[in-house]
């Protein structure tokens, strides 16, 4: 159920899709002490175009004013900045085995309240064309709140309510079908019994007439 909900909510957040790549907004609520994935997906407009991409992530802690760089990922190498808030907690979860990065997501393990704030995923892409090269840059912004326990979103609540309504409706329909079938079978059985009784009376009457005819003949 959770997997299905997670899929429905993700599909609803789709912003664009080019050449099989789908851009999905990141979740924005992390639970204290748990692992949280911050999504950063940047699709190319043309999948057939060769490209090289690298990313830099910056962070502004809640209550502060300046962004600080926390990591850089380029040529399959993750370079982490010295920041005790993220030391031993950041794991690369984006594209692997390619320089053409489109998924630039990260994991933060053992989330703390110090991780609440604004994240920026800076995407730098070099596109290779036949006669020239072209640089592009995109910034994905994510605001993250850290809470004590997970809050159920409205989609989850509505989905669960609809599930229970569907169960009730199906149960009522099933009971109605069973009652209908029972009445139909009972009516057919009663009709067959009446028909058999009529045939029995007809046979009995005919037998009596035959017996009377035999007696008269004697």
Swiss-Prot record:
Annotated GO MF terms: sodium channel inhibitor activity; sodium channel regulator activity; transmembrane transporter binding
SUPFAM superfamilies: Immunoglobulin
Keyword match Disulfide bond: yes
Signal peptide range: 1-18
Quaternary assembly: A voltage-gated sodium (Nav) channel consists of an ion-conducting pore-forming alpha subunit functional on its own that is regulated by one or more beta subunits. Interacts with SCN1A; regulatory subunit of SCN1A/Nav1.1. Interacts with SCN3A; regulatory subunit of SCN3A/Nav1.3. Interacts with SCN4A; regulatory subunit of SCN4A/Nav1.4. Interacts with SCN5A; regulatory subunit of SCN5A/Nav1.5. Interacts with SCN8A; regulatory subunit of SCN8A/Nav1.6. Interacts with SCN9A; regulatory subunit of SCN9A/Nav1.7. Interacts with SCN10A; regulatory subunit of SCN10A/Nav1.8. Interacts with NFASC.
Ig-like C2-type domain sequence ranges: 22-150
Protein's name according to its UniProt entry: Sodium channel regulatory subunit beta-1
Chain's gene name: SCN1B
Topological region Extracellular: 19-157
Record keywords: Cell membrane, Cell projection, Disulfide bond, Glycoprotein, Immunoglobulin domain, Ion transport, Membrane, Signal, Sodium, Sodium transport, Transmembrane, Transmembrane helix, Transport
Family: Belongs to the sodium channel auxiliary subunit SCN1B (TC 8.A.17) family.
């Amino acid at each position: 159920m959770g997997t299905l909900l997670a899929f429905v909510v993700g599909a609803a957040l789709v912003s664009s899709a080019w050449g099989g790549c789908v851009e999905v907004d990141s979740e924005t609520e992390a639970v204290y002490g748990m692992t949280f994935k911050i999504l950063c997906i940047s699709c190319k407009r043309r999948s057939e175009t060769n490209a090289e991409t690298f990313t830099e992530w910056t962070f502004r802690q809640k209550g502060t004013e300046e962004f600080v760089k926390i990591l850089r990922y380029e040529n399959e190498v993750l370079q982490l900045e010295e920041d005790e808030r993220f030391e031993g907690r950041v794991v690369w979860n984006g594209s692997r085995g390619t320089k053409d990065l489109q998924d630039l997501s990260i994991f933060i393990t053992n989330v703390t309240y110090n991780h609440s704030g604004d994240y920026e995923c800076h995407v730098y892409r070099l596109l290779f064309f036949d006669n020239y090269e072209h640089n592009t840059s995109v910034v994905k912004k994510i605001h993250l709140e850290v809470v004590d326990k997970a809050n159920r979103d409205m989609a989850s609540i509505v989905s669960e309510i609809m599930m229970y309504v569907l169960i009730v409706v199906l149960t009522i329909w099933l009971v109605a079908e069973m009652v209908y079938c029972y009445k139909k079978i009972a009516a057919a059985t009663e009709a067959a019994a009446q028909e058999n009784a009529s045939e029995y009376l007809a046979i009995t009457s005919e037998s009596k007439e035959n017996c009377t005819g035999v007696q008269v003949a004697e």
